[in-house]
């Protein structure tokens, strides 16, 4: 069963991307897709700019990495980072709860919480 939760206030809907055989959140930024075929994980792209080369450096990290990094930043009361774009596929509501927790604390307008695809 597939459930799609849509944020009615969002400007974009969740769309199906046939190239990676999964759903993606079509945000206003450039979409960077993971090459992974694993549908039981989330893959986020976080804006990262270590050397200020060409204004920014985008890279993809796994859900485990982004959640661990997010928790570390929350503990240190550091909220100055943004999740700029994402591919979000979940088989567990635990993932949604973590994303919800982070989105409540991160100073980012990225509306990911209501955009979840459950594949189980």
UniProtKB/Swiss-Prot annotation:
Physiological role: Counteracts the defense-associated sirtuin 2 (DSR2) defense system of the host. Inhibits the NADase activity of host DSR2 by competing with the tail tube protein that normally activates DSR2.
UniProt protein name: DSR anti-defense 1
Gene name tied to this protein: yotI
Impact noted for substituting residue 19 to E: Complete loss of the ability to inactivate the host DSR2 NADase activity
Domain of life, source organism: Viruses
Acetylation recorded as keyword: no
Site note Interaction with host DSR2, residues: 59
Keywords: Host-virus interaction, Inhibition of host innate immune response by virus, Viral immunoevasion
GO biological process, one term: symbiont-mediated suppression of host innate immune response
Outcome of substituting residue 21 to E: Complete loss of the ability to inactivate the host DSR2 NADase activity
Family: Belongs to the DSR anti-defense 1 family.
Subunit-level organization: Interacts with Bacillus subtilis DSR2 (via C-terminus) in a 2:4 ratio; this interaction leads to the absence of activation of the NADase defense activity of DSR2.
Keyword flag Phosphoprotein: no
